[in-house]
Amino acid sequence: MAGSYGVMADDGSIDYTVHEAWNEATNVYLIVILVSFGLFMYAKRNKRKIMRIFSVPPTEGMLSEPSFYDTVSRIRLRQQVEAHPVSRKYEYQQPQSQADSVQLSLE
């Protein structure tokens, strides 16, 4: 039976080369699966670190543009600065008199 691909060799003993190859292949697959699972768990725990690696740093044009919250706070500050003299002007124009107060009398 020369050249046969059976499990039995010519002398009647079992040929283990197929089994050894299968065992080696399954060991490799098992290692690949375990390493993949470990990498998945690491990525799940350290998502922010990994995303920081792949994020593009801001360009020069982005640095000159202020953020939305900075713009809003500056607008609000400017509005307060503009409104302050107006309120002071109104306070100085109104004489401090008793006409603004209400007096109650009991009868």
From Swiss-Prot:
Residues 93-107 have a biased composition (Polar residues). It is a single-pass membrane protein. It is found in: Membrane. Keywords: Membrane, Transmembrane, Transmembrane helix. It comes from the Eukaryota. GO terms for cellular component: membrane. Its main location: membrane. Signal peptide: none annotated. Residues 88-107 are annotated as: Disordered. The chain crosses the membrane at residues 25-43. Belongs to the SMIM19 family. This is Small integral membrane protein 19. It comes from Mus musculus (Mouse).
